[in-house]
């Protein structure tokens, strides 16, 4: 079966938790599209282009992974990409309710699109982009939570943002 999956997110920035789920999805599906959302309701530190570039760098070793920026409804993006599966990560029980609602909405909008939930490796279960940015903003070392290129880009971004 030729299964194309989409792993959508803001990835601001991509963390080791994201990378772990991407690697595992790449083993499960023939082709994985990392859909990086423009998402106007969030105010990302990195531009869409920067996020696409960082995710490309982190996933360059995965031959069946493609990185694409998008805006608009996820179900429309999935149709454009001819994907039949959405991959979502669940870090904790607290993520489940939101993801459950989202999966049901996506199913209502696109009945043929299945949601598959993956849980992170234990060492990544607490990592979020928000926490990584917060640690970096206060001068903490984020190298254990993100790829080295992401840590460098984040440090440069925060240095530019300081008054």
Swiss-Prot record:
Catalytic activity from the UniProt record: (R)-4'-phosphopantetheine + ATP + H(+) = 3'-dephospho-CoA + diphosphate
Residues binding substrate: 10, 42, 74, 88
Amino acids binding ATP: 10-11, 18, 89-91, 99, 124-130
One term of GO molecular function: pantetheine-phosphate adenylyltransferase activity
Site (Transition state stabilizer): 18
Protein localization: Cytoplasm
Gene Ontology cellular component annotations, sorted alphabetically: cytoplasm
SUPFAM superfamilies with a match to the protein in the record: Nucleotidylyl transferase
Keywords per UniProt: ATP-binding, Coenzyme A biosynthesis, Cytoplasm, Magnesium, Nucleotide-binding, Nucleotidyltransferase, Transferase
EC number: 2.7.7.3
GO biological process, one term: coenzyme A biosynthetic process
Role according to the record: Reversibly transfers an adenylyl group from ATP to 4'-phosphopantetheine, yielding dephospho-CoA (dPCoA) and pyrophosphate.
PANTHER family assigned to the protein according to its UniProt record, in alphabetical order: PHOSPHOPANTETHEINE ADENYLYLTRANSFERASE
Family designation: Belongs to the bacterial CoaD family.
Name of this chain's protein: Phosphopantetheine adenylyltransferase
Originating species: Shewanella baltica (strain OS155 / ATCC BAA-1091)
